[in-house]
Amino acid sequence: MALYEAVIGLEVHAQLRTRSKLFCSCSTAFGSAPNTNVCEVCSGMPGVLPVPNARAVEYAARMGMAVNCTVNPVSVFARKNYFYPDLPKGYQISQFETPICEHGHLNISVNGQTRRIGITRIHMEDDAGKNIHSAGDNASYVDLNRSGVPLIEIVSEPDMRSAEEAVAYLKALHAIVVYLGICDGNMEEGSFRCDANVSIRPKGQQEFGTRAELKNLNSFRNVQRAIEYEIARQQDVLEDGDAVVQETRLYDAVKNVTVSMRGKEEAHDYRYFPDPDLMPVRIAEDDLVRWRADLPELPQARVARFMSAYDLSEQDADVLTADRALADFFEAATAACGQPKKVANLMQGALLRELNQRAVTVDAIAMRPEALGELVRIIEAGLISAKIANDIFGELVETGAMPEAFVKERGLVQISDTSAIETAVDEAIAENPAEVEAYKGGKTKLISFFMGQIMRKTKGKANPALVTELLQKKLG
């Protein structure tokens, strides 16, 4: 790739978390029985009139503010005309010449370097239905539950130069929509998805190469792998003396390849024109001021604050702010014990382990942040060892019990009585003379063996620091 550079732009669709659809009152609930959340409007019956969802307009504007866009006080819905079985009206209601937001940007960090990625526009549109193909009865079905669900499409400038930058940008957008509460960010269910436009050009050339549009990118990993494959494919085409063809390509995650769907000659002419059934969307200045004032602290600002206020590394701050609820949990736990680095370590280790095993988010568990803060406090006070804390962490997450009362009730309080530990140390030394001689002969790693023996004798409750001190003293 040394002779070429990649040019990448992303088109990201985020399904808005409204309770009703963009132009009717049907539910947006995911997973309902097919064709149960459908009415005359979202099924495209003649003679009905759409009514815009005010909450969707607010959410789109908030997103624009979060990524430094100009929010247009007047925007226009347009009809995007094409035929597909899951599009009952024969057109999609979108925005074209006058979108709700435009001219924004988002900063990303990759390998310690900060890049500014331009955002061309954000526009509102209604989603299509879903085609379901059944091989068993050789038939295809259409589920219109998704038809009319509100989306925003976030279109970037072609400013990314690698798959890593594209994923960093996508993750940054994902964090923002989740922080704002306007989208649940679920890529598996399709509520956050993207298409990638990828081309390559000789380094130093200003003119863009011929691009391919990649579809079926339903995870961050697939976005990275698909773009990497497509860059390599286009390079092979050029090095073989052929020309890259402008086309739409589907990513096959199993084979890790992109496959041609349709070429340029098959591309749609959407024949956009303003929707005659919808008035222009007008946003009052008072609403814009109020929405901007209500914006939460956004992920990048929170990362910077965590690094300065809590002295965390950028990596730790990134992990803890990736989810708004997780960041809130961290701050509440830190407030309970005053040990931000200890809290960060425990959350990134034991807590994330438990969340991943249960496949849940932190706001779905019984443990409260005050309990985690108390756990840090009793570890630091020597009431229990870090090992005991790790052993009981799953139960604390499951039950929501406060740690100090829990360990006292279970008899897990750490032994810090020197005489009691010294007895266990003396026994371990007396029972293992060969290991004692080997240790004295230079095999100092055997201290871990003796530590294990003593922990077995004390059922894991001996103070590790005191055990180490006594062992080193007695073994010489």
Swiss-Prot record:
It catalyses: L-glutamyl-tRNA(Gln) + L-glutamine + ATP + H2O = L-glutaminyl-tRNA(Gln) + L-glutamate + ADP + phosphate + H(+); L-aspartyl-tRNA(Asn) + L-glutamine + ATP + H2O = L-asparaginyl-tRNA(Asn) + L-glutamate + ADP + phosphate + 2 H(+). It holds the Pfam family GatB_N. It is an enzyme of class 6 (ligase). The keyword Protein biosynthesis applies. It comes from the Bacteria. Its EC number is 6.3.5.-. GO terms for molecular function: asparaginyl-tRNA synthase (glutamine-hydrolyzing) activity; ATP binding; glutaminyl-tRNA synthase (glutamine-hydrolyzing) activity. GO terms for biological process: glutaminyl-tRNAGln biosynthesis via transamidation; translation. Keywords: ATP-binding, Ligase, Nucleotide-binding, Protein biosynthesis. InterPro entries: Asn/Gln-tRNA_amidoTrfase_suB/E, Asn/Gln-tRNA_Trfase_suB/E_cat, Asn/Gln_amidotransferase, Asn/Gln_tRNA_amidoTrase-B-like, GatB, GatB_C_1, GatB_Yqey_C_2, Gln-tRNA_amidoTrfase_suB_CS. Heterotrimer of A, B and C subunits. Belongs to the GatB/GatE family. GatB subfamily. Allows the formation of correctly charged Asn-tRNA(Asn) or Gln-tRNA(Gln) through the transamidation of misacylated Asp-tRNA(Asn) or Glu-tRNA(Gln) in organisms which lack either or both of asparaginyl-tRNA or glutaminyl-tRNA synthetases. The reaction takes place in the presence of glutamine and ATP through an activated phospho-Asp-tRNA(Asn) or phospho-Glu-tRNA(Gln). HAMAP family: GatB (MF_00121). This is Aspartyl/glutamyl-tRNA(Asn/Gln) amidotransferase subunit B. The gene is gatB.
